[in-house]
């Protein structure tokens, strides 16, 4: 039996390389998705702080108590401090993105029942001994605060003004011009 011609052999390693590259890409995508989910969940306090501070369209139209607001600020900052510096910009944009999604949901369902659909995120905060419960029985708060709908760039400016200063984190200048709604593509 003759040895096989040389030229057919190099094909094997190439396809393996391609497979490895594909696997790496898939892994990276999965990691980014997981990171994004974590960021979005952890940054709910940041979103609430920005919403609250600027009275942007808010599902819980009640104004938060001062103690709760301070707690949200602390939680938000703790999460921002844990995020590596190169991801902080992404984190702020995730907050902005979440606020924009939140506004869009608000627009779609402006019936009174939307009061309760946004109670969920509050339960996720690690608040200790159940000291805070969303004050659902607060009828006079409904409709008393007229939330404003803001365009994307204004929300982004507000978030960039509020969060880095509040938590004393450094956000690089290019962060202000990062694109919207396209996360994990670069």
Curated annotation (Swiss-Prot):
UniProt keyword annotations, A-Z: Allergen, Repeat, Seed storage protein, Storage protein
Identify the SMART domains for this entry. AAI
One GO MF term, please?
Answer: nutrient reservoir activity
Query: InterPro entries attached here?
Result: Bifun_inhib/LTP/seed_sf, Bifunc_inhib/LTP/seed_store, Glia_glutenin
Q: Does the keyword Cytoplasm apply?
A: no
Where are the annotated segments for Disordered? 1-20
Q: How is it modified after translation?
A: Substrate of transglutaminase.
**Classification via Pfam families:** Gliadin (PF13016)
Instruction: Check the record and name the Gene3D superfamilies matching this protein.
Output: Plant lipid-transfer and hydrophobic proteins
What is this protein's function? Gliadin is the major seed storage protein in wheat.
The UniProt similarity line reads: Belongs to the gliadin/glutenin family.
The remark listed among the other comments is: The alpha/beta-gliadins can be divided into 5 homology classes. Sequence divergence between the classes is due to single base substitutions and to duplications or deletions within or near direct repeats. There are more than a 100 copies of the gene for alpha/beta-gliadin per haploid genome.
Protein's recorded name? Alpha/beta-gliadin clone PTO-A10
């Amino acid at each position: 039996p003759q040895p096989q011609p040389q030229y057919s052999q190099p094909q094997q390693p190439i396809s393996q390389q391609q497979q490895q590259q594909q696997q790496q890409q898939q892994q990276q995508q999965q990691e980014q998705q997981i990171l994004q989910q974590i960021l979005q969940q952890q940054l709910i306090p940041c979103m609430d702080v920005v919403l609250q501070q600027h009275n942007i369209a808010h599902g819980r139209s009640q104004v938060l108590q001062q103690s709760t607001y301070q707690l949200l600020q602390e939680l938000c900052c703790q999460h921002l401090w844990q995020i590596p510096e190169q991801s902080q910009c992404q984190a702020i944009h995730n907050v902005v993105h979440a606020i924009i999604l939140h506004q869009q949901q608000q627009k779609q369902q402006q019936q009174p029942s939307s009061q309760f659909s946004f109670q969920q995120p509050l339960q996720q905060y690690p608040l200790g001994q159940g000291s805070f419960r969303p004050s659902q029985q607060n009828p006079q708060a409904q409709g008393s605060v007229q939330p404003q709908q803001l365009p994307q760039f204004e929300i982004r400016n507000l978030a960039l003004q509020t969060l880095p200063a509040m938590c004393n984190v450094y956000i690089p200048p290019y962060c202000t011009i990062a694109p919207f709604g396209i996360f994990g593509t670069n």
